[in-house]
Amino acid sequence: MIEDTMTLLSLLGRIMRYFLLRPETLFLLCISLALWSYFFHTDEVKTIVKSSRDAVKMVKGKVAEIMQNDRLGGLDVLEAEFSKTWEFKNHNVAVYSIQGRRDHMEDRFEVLTDLANKTHPSIFGIFDGHGGETAAEYVKSRLPEALKQHLQDYEKDKENSVLSYQTILEQQILSIDREMLEKLTVSYDEAGTTCLIALLSDKDLTVANVGDSRGVLCDKDGNAIPLSHDHKPYQLKERKRIKRAGGFISFNGSWRVQGILAMSRSLGDYPLKNLNVVIPDPDILTFDLDKLQPEFMILASDGLWDAFSNEEAVRFIKERLDEPHFGAKSIVLQSFYRGCPDNITVMVVKFRNSSKTEEQ
């Protein structure tokens, strides 16, 4: 009886080895496991895949940083992958901008200074377009110049004026939006743009923001001080305003107004402006330079902020202020290699009280 049982088990073992160890059987087993994981454990699989992608991004970022610090030409190797780049350097301000992985470049920037005569405060602007480049180009080519003219008039008779930097900024931003909407509506152009403007005088820094471009300042202690706050649909104040206007927000990778726009305020975007769910009203803040004694500020499109936190960006730039672009070029390249899919524009402005800053 025992011998018969052993013989039967031995026979079953040989049969199982014959079938289970065949290549086609192993292949079918792998396919079955993959299908079972996909249909019954989708979330777990997605988590593993996302973690793997994040790990790859981190490794690529580390490689990029090593190459960026390589004085033997590492940056030139990286730049070969960019379809288009723009750069600017003058006195205490430097800008670096790349098209990156996008098919079109919709970022714009502008710098207007009069360091010799000081007929107006220095004007720095970042404009991150969407739905085409029309809106960003329109605002970039008109708003800074309009601000310059009004600020020059204001400086001539400041003591007797009822205006201020804040009121001039608000008036001109709203005016340029109305003017642009008329033209975009006629041509059925649905383009829009953010608007981040900083006015730098001897004692004050005034920053106006519409959208999700962002400004951050490094104070005397190395702290990251926010100069603006992103206008996002998920924010309670913005969400309530959109709901009161009869609109809605929905999630499609990110929270969007009417399921379309990933910011709650912008210039342009005439279809959403007609519904009153997106507005052009800027938030404006003024900072006392004597109190903060800042070293530098960063103004950038959201391509940077998708890859860096405020604090991380300040630390990164602080370590690279001696570079030709004050670290702007390096942080743009690092953002690209962290996987940012967007256009990336970074402006770094060094303040005159910094020991490393050229005379403003």
Swiss-Prot record:
Pfam families: PP2C. It catalyses: O-phospho-L-seryl-[protein] + H2O = L-seryl-[protein] + phosphate; O-phospho-L-threonyl-[protein] + H2O = L-threonyl-[protein] + phosphate. The keyword Signal does not apply. It is an enzyme of class 3 (hydrolase). It comes from Homo sapiens. Residues 43-360 are cytoplasmic. GO terms for molecular function: metal ion binding; protein serine/threonine phosphatase activity. Its main location: membrane. It is a single-pass type I membrane protein. InterPro entries: PP2C (IPR015655), PP2C_BS (IPR000222), PPM-type-like_dom_sf (IPR036457), PPM-type_phosphatase-like_dom (IPR001932). This is Protein phosphatase 1L. The lineage of its organism: Eukaryota, Metazoa, Chordata, Craniata, Vertebrata. Keywords: Hydrolase, Magnesium, Manganese, Membrane, Metal-binding, Protein phosphatase, Transmembrane, Transmembrane helix.
